[in-house]
Structure formats: C-alpha cells, structure tokens
Regions:
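N-terminal binding-site loop/beta-alpha segment at the start of enzyme catalytic domains
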Residues: 1-84
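Substrate-binding cleft and catalytic face of glycoside hydrolase catalytic domains
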Residues: 86-96
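Glycine/proline-rich, positively charged
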Residues: 95-114
C-alpha cells in the first residue's frame, strides 16, 4: 500500500480509502466489519463517512447508520488508533439532516456530539 503524510502530523494515510456510503442500507454491520478487516489486511487505514450516509436510498430512518456502524466496529475492535477517519457535513435542505437547518456552530456541535 502507498501512503501519504497527513500534513505535518506524522500520520501516514493510505492512498486508498474505504467508503461507507451504503453501510446501513445495502450493507449490514457484518458486511461492514468484513470490509474494514479486509481493507486493514491490505494496508488501507483510511475510512470515509458523512452525516447523511447511507444515501442508497437516503431516508430519515437510516440517516446516521453508517456512523453508528463504524462506531460499533471501533468499540468492538479497539483499533480506533489505527484508522484515519474522514467525515463530511451536508448543507441546508435535507429535512432528515439537522431538520433542514443551515450549517452553524450549534448545528455542527450537535452533529458531532449527538
């Protein structure tokens, strides 16, 4: 696996990233666990998520499931320190995300802290 330096942090990030957009809708916790383990076995240490995942299809019932799946894996595996996790927020407009409110310090804090 090839790696890049994350700024001047000393952290090495794999050039390949495991996306999680379908975890919680098209893929189960068990599927995600298996995908993460296979990725780690191949040197991938970079996971990507977003507050609006899963998006296939996007629904209020599944919104946030991807992050819960990753959190469950972290808790079970005790390998959080081995993973570089990227996340994203979405803008205003989706009622299922932050009740459609615009991005603000308060909405960011709520999204991060639950």
């Amino acid at each position: 696996m090839k790696y890049s330096e994350l700024g001047q942090s000393g952290i090495k990030v794999s050039k390949l990233c495991l996306g999680s957009m379908t975890w919680g809708s098209q893929n189960s916790q068990e599927d995600a666990n298996r995908q993460i383990e296979i990725s780690l076995d191949h040197g991938i240490n970079f996971l990507d998520t977003a507050e609006m995942y899963p998006t296939t299809p996007r629904s209020i019932e599944t919104q946030g499931d991807t992050e819960r799946i990753i959190g469950h894996w972290f808790n079970k595996s005790r390998q959080r320190s081995n993973i570089v996790l990227a996340t994203k927020i979405t803008g205003k407009g989706f009622k299922s995300i932050r009740n459609g409110e615009p991005i603000s310090i308060l909405s960011l804090r709520t999204a991060l802290e639950g």
